[in-house]
């Protein structure tokens, strides 16, 4: 049975980890694309492909002039340098795989950011994603299953992927600096509703406890400026 990841954002793969105080960060990689020829991936490995369905619930989006996680060292998100551009307290849910290349009318409160130069866009979302899809390699089509693996027969089934840890056996609540070539890096943090990261010892059965959000944040190679003429 094959295992492969469906992500629109770069796939995040963990190796070693490093720590600041009581919080732990994994080491990010952008992953390897699934191959349409044999082998699709290395033995016992994983690969990334674009899904047919990728449902995400978004609570907030914004832009910051300074890193709100201070180089992955902050326990809580510091939004003092940030401008919020979208908010929905109950969350806006959408299938973003189906929306590729189209405009999405998001339900919530939209705001113009304050004038300034921004390097750190962020998104606060639910740490639960609904995905399905298929991928054909060397003449065999693999379909997603409800358990998160893949099968070579049947039809693609939905899988609810809940991110509860970026490593283990302790709680790894940070996933820093996956590279997006020509754009910058992307990091992710598992947080509670107050945007506080789980401590390394906040873990049960291999999962970080008290988590119900994920913050995705980019560090842009080229910051952008909002002015009165924008």
How would you label these PLM feature ranges?
Residues 20-230:
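A short, solvent-exposed, low-complexity linear motif enriched for acidic/polar residues
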Residues 2-9:
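Sec-dependent signal peptide recognition
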Residues 14-16:
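N-terminal signal peptide c-region/cleavage motif recognized by signal peptidases
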């Amino acid at each position: 049975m094959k295992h492969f990841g469906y992500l629109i954002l770069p796939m995040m793969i963990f190796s070693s980890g490093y720590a600041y105080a009581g919080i732990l960060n994994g080491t990010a990689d952008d992953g390897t694309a699934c191959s349409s020829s044999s082998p699709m991936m290395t033995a016992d490995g994983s690969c990334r492909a674009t899904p047919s369905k990728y449902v995400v619930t978004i609570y907030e989006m914004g832009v910051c002039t300074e890193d709100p996680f201070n180089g992955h060292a902050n326990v809580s998100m510091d939004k003092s340098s940030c401008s919020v551009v979208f908010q929905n307290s109950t969350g806006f849910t959408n299938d973003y795989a189906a929306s590729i290349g189209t405009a999405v009318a998001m339900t919530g409160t939209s705001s113009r950011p304050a004038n300034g130069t921004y390097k750190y866009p962020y998104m606060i979302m639910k740490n639960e994603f609904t995905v399905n899809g298929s991928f054909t390699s060397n003449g065999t089509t693999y379909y997603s299953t409800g358990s998160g693996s893949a099968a070579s027969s049947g039809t693609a089934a939905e899988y609810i992927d809940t991110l509860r840890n970026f490593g283990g056996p302790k709680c790894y609540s940070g996933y820093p600096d996956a590279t997006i070539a020509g754009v910058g890096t992307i990091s992710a943090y598992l947080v509670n509703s107050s945007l506080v990261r789980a401590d390394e010892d906040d873990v049960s059965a291999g999962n970080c406890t008290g988590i119900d959000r994920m913050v995705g944040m980019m560090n842009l190679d080229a910051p952008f400026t909002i002015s009165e003429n924008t």
